[in-house]
Design a protein with these regions (language model features):
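Intrinsic low-complexity, intrinsically disordered or marginally ordered coil/linker segments
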Residues: 1-97
């Protein structure tokens, strides 16, 4: 299993440990806003989002409305995106609208 995330059509950022990004969706949902991979950075006490979903594409954080923390133990942490992963470690803060 892999640490993956998606942004649903309702703008929910959802985390999980799954084989495929589609496994994060319920039967009546779809994902138009992409996804990727995630990891917890213990040093920064933050969640790092990186990569893209082969099923749903690159994440569109402009469509993010809220974060569902259930898939990461329910603990809210700062979010950062690595847009150029794996080529550099630039971190861009991610926030909800």
């Amino acid at each position: 299993m892999y640490q993956k995330f998606i942004i649903t059509d309702e703008g929910e950022l959802r985390f999980g440990n799954v084989y495929h990004h589609r496994n994060l969706l319920r039967w009546d949902e779809s994902c138009s806003y992409g996804g990727g991979l995630w990891r917890v950075d213990e040093e920064r006490e933050a969640v790092i989002l990186y990569g893209r979903s082969f099923e749903f594409g690159t994440p569109e954080f402009g469509s993010l409305r809220y974060v569902n923390w259930d898939g990461i133990d329910g603990v809210e942490r700062p979010l950062f995106y690595q847009p150029h992963w794996p080529y550099d470690e630039t971190l861009v803060p991610v926030a909800c609208l």
